[in-house]
Amino acid sequence: MREYKVVVLGSGGVGKSALTVQFVTGTFIEKYDPTIEDFYRKEIEVDSSPSVLEILDTAGTEQFASMRDLYIKNGQGFILVYSLVNQQSFQDIKPMRDQIIRVKRYEKVPVILVGNKVDLESEREVSSNEGRALAEEWGCPFMETSAKSKTMVDELFAEIVRQMNYAAQPDKDDPCCSACNIQ
């Protein structure tokens, strides 16, 4: 059974913990309690292949930003979360993706861009088109989720597994890496 390390990144209050807890336990956290660092494990079957996800739910506040390099160094897949009802959280996600590329020293890191809180449609500040355009620029999948209504939560974690599975395959067009798997 494959084990993967997934890191959930985003500003404070965007719903990183709520998404993670909803996926792992099937419950919604109503009260906001800022995270410093939480670690979860869950078995998941994606495309008939079992995997174990080790999910690191990170602090969104800037005072813990210095810890991000370590999280990123150890992560294999990244879920970048912003709140659809907070334009600033969308802007804040861009330097986080840049930090992933800088630490990993590789452009093709498995990343999913996630607009959370789709259940608050009437308060939306970030359009679907803005999210899609950024994901297209980055060459990664884009999803809109709701931890509260469980919209696309399971699909999100299944997709990051697919992205990590794909990244683990050697590049058939690159003769240097056709016989090895460098991570």
Curated annotation (Swiss-Prot):
It is an enzyme of class 3 (hydrolase). Residues 181-183 form a propeptide. GTP binds at residues 10-17, 57-61, 116-119. It is a lipid-anchor. SUPFAM superfamilies: P-loop containing nucleoside triphosphate hydrolases (SSF52540). Its EC number is 3.6.5.2. A motif (Effector region) lies at residues 32-40. Gene3D superfamilies: P-loop containing nucleotide triphosphate hydrolases. A lipid is attached at residue 180 (S-farnesyl cysteine). Changing residue 180 to A: Loss of association with membranes. CDD domains: Rap2. Ubiquitinated; undergoes 'Lys-63' monoubiquitination and diubiquitination by NEDD4. Multiple lysine residues are probably modified. Ubiquitination requires TNIK, prevents interaction with effectors and inactivates RAP2A. Ubiquitination by the ECS(RAB40B) complex leads to RAP2A localization to lamellipodia plasma membrane, activation, and regulation of sorting at early endosomes for recycling to the lamellipodia plasma membrane. Palmitoylated. Palmitoylation is required for association with recycling endosome membranes and activation of TNIK. It is found in: Midbody; Cell projection, Lamellipodium membrane; Golgi apparatus; Recycling endosome membrane. The modification Cysteine methyl ester is found at residue 180. A lipid is attached at residues 176-177 (S-palmitoyl cysteine). GO terms for molecular function: G protein activity; GDP binding; GTP binding; GTPase activity; magnesium ion binding. GO terms for cellular component: cytosol; membrane; midbody; recycling endosome; recycling endosome membrane; Schaffer collateral - CA1 synapse; synaptic membrane. NCBIfam families: small_GTP. Interacts with PLCE1. Interacts with ARHGAP29, SGSM1, SGSM2 and SGSM3. Interacts (GTP-bound form preferentially) with MAP4K4. Interacts with MINK1. Interacts with cytoskeletal actin. Interacts (GTP-bound form) with RUNDC3A. Interacts (GTP-bound form preferentially) with TNIK (via the CNH domain); the interaction is direct and recruits RAP2A to the E3 ubiquitin ligase NEDD4. Interacts with RGS14; the interaction is GTP-dependent. Transgenic mice expressing a constitutively active form of Rap2a display impaired spatial learning and defective extinction of contextual fear. This is Ras-related protein Rap-2a. It comes from Mus musculus. The gene is Rap2a.
